[in-house]
């Protein structure tokens, strides 16, 4: 399901958006969506996290969970009202910041409010379904449904059925429809009551919830801002057109982290249980294993992207415009590798008795990112914004992992990451040799340049991938990977005999 959504998003972004939208319009849609995600994330007041924590205290099928789901709807509404008021109070400074280089965003800035509202309740009702162990349908709506509707919106705009105003309205309605579908599904379960029971909430529970919520709000102020700093700094300082070019580059780099979600989702419950049982030795082994496989997956995907980056941009409509951000792809991909490989350390900290330190490290990350963006964007443009992200995350993880290593005695690093890095560097050197001395002969064989590039890419990629897999296997980097290869070879051998 996740990969189906990625495929739809890939087609939409690379072949529809880049062909039919100007770079400024691409930047506009990115800033609108990111601003809406930020507002919705803050307005939730940490409900999605606190719902997971406190639902067991309310869970009672006979009493329809004592109105828990009513609280889960009311609290975000309060948060939305508060942050919408703040939005209007700071509207003028926000508009002044964007007006010089991103005036088009200022024209559509008020659409952030309805889009954020729909996004907020989309997540609220998905969380409610997850609490009832109903995960598939809400995830399908978010991962596939929204992307399909977004594709339809862009096609309507491409064929001039709707204008720019209509496209922005339709994008808002996309999230609205998804939210309504989640509500319908939740009610179809016939287990939900939104009638609040204030008398059921004990004094202790109320106090604990308030304190925990304040912690989540403080954390979310920083953590929700981080993913969107680049978008806001690039659009505000360099304009929506540059932000649009940067958006495509970031999307390409984000392919690196596709395996991260699945691996992280599988590992978190085990880390949580290990920390609860104080099995630090087992947690340390698990963390090293998770970090290694995240690193292997992300760096090999990055390798495949980077050796084919010129072909990728040549296939994208208007690729000669978007390839200005080629260096951004490189830097952001490295950021993604760092984040996917080392985020398991942050997971350990969040499940430990020192969880409150995560707020401190997140604040450090935010401040570093802001300072670096302000410093580097005037010097290097969108590449400066990418470097700001890289420096910020390196500082963040260096401090966080030192703390986790000293206080919790957990360390995600091993020599196997170093060996993997050496293998990938060797593959890059081999690819450089192939491109210098062999690719030109392949390209000369074809009159059509694109066909020649594709054939060359397929041959080089296949050859290098086989060398990479063989090297990982031969040096016994991962027992799990070796087991998969052995089973595959055994299957082929048996099949051949038959």
Regions found by a protein language model. Name each.
Residues 1-49, 80-88, 115, 211-236, ...:
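Signature of the first transmembrane helix
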Residues 118-144, 333-364, 404-406:
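Membrane-interface junctions at transmembrane-helix termini in multi-pass inner-membrane proteins
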Residues 140-155, 160-190, 250, 363-368, ...:
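Hydrophobic alpha-helical transmembrane segments
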Residues 433-498:
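Membrane-proximal transmembrane or re-entrant/amphipathic helices at the cytosolic face
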Residues 91-112, 240, 306-336, 446-451:
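Interfacial segments at transmembrane-helix termini and the short loops linking adjacent helices
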Residues 160, 164-170, 182-227, 270-285, ...:
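Interhelical loop/hinge segments that connect adjacent transmembrane helices in multipass membrane
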Residues 14, 44-60, 131, 249-291, ...:
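Helix-loop junctions and terminal segments of transmembrane helices
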């Amino acid at each position: 399901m996740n990969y189906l959504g990625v495929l739809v998003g890939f087609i939409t972004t690379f072949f529809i958006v880049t062909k039919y939208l100007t770079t400024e319009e691409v930047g506009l849609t990115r800033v609108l969506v990111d601003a809406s995600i930020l507002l919705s994330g803050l307005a939730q007041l940490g409900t999605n996290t606190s719902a997971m924590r406190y639902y067991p205290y309310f869970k009672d099928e006979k009493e329809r969970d004592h109105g828990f789901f009513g609280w889960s709807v009311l609290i975000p509404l309060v948060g939305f009202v508060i942050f919408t008021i703040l939005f209007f109070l700071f509207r003028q400074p926000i508009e002044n910041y964007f007006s010089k280089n991103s005036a088009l965003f200022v024209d559509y800035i008020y659409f952030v409010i309805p889009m954020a509202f729909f996004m907020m309740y989309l997540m609220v009702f998905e969380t409610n379904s997850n609490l009832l162990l109903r995960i598939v349908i809400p995830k399908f709506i978010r991962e596939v449904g929204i992307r399909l509707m977004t594709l339809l919106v862009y096609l309507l705009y491409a064929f001039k059925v709707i204008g720019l105003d209509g496209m922005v309205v339709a994008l808002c309605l996309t999230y609205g429809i998804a939210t309504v579908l989640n509500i319908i599904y939740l009610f179809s379960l016939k287990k939900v009551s939104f009638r609040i029971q204030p008398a059921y909430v004990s004094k202790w529970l109320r106090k604990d919830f308030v304190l925990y919520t304040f912690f989540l709000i403080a954390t979310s102020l920083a953590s929700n801002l981080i993913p969107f700093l680049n978008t806001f700094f690039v659009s505000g300082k360099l304009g929506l057109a540059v932000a649009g070019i940067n958006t495509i580059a970031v999307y390409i780099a984000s392919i690196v982290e596709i395996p991260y979600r699945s691996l992280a989702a599988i590992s978190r419950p085990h880390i949580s249980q290990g920390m609860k049982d104080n099995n630090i030795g087992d947690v340390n082994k698990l963390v090293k294993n998770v970090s290694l496989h995240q690193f292997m997956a992300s760096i090999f995907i990055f390798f495949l992207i980077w050796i084919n980056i010129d072909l990728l941009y040549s296939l994208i409509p208007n690729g000669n415009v978007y390839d200005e951000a080629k260096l951004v792809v490189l830097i952001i991909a490295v950021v993604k590798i760092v984040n996917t490989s080392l985020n398991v350390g942050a997971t350990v900290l969040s499940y430990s008795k020192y969880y409150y330190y995560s707020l401190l490290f997140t604040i450090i990350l935010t401040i570093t990112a802001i300072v670096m963006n302000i410093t580097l964007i005037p010097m290097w443009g969108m590449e400066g914004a990418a470097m700001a992200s890289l420096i910020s995350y390196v500082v963040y993880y260096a401090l966080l992992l030192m703390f986790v290593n000293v206080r919790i005695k957990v360390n995600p690093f091993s020599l196997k990451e170093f060996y993997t890095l050496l293998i990938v560097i060797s593959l890059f050197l081999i690819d450089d040799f192939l491109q210098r001395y062999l690719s030109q002969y392949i390209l000369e064989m074809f009159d059509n340049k694109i066909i020649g590039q594709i054939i060359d890419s397929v041959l080089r990629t296949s050859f290098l991938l086989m060398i990479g897999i063989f090297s990982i296997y031969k040096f016994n980097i991962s027992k799990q990977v070796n087991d998969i290869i052995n089973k595959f070879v055994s299957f082929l051998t048996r099949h051949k005999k038959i």
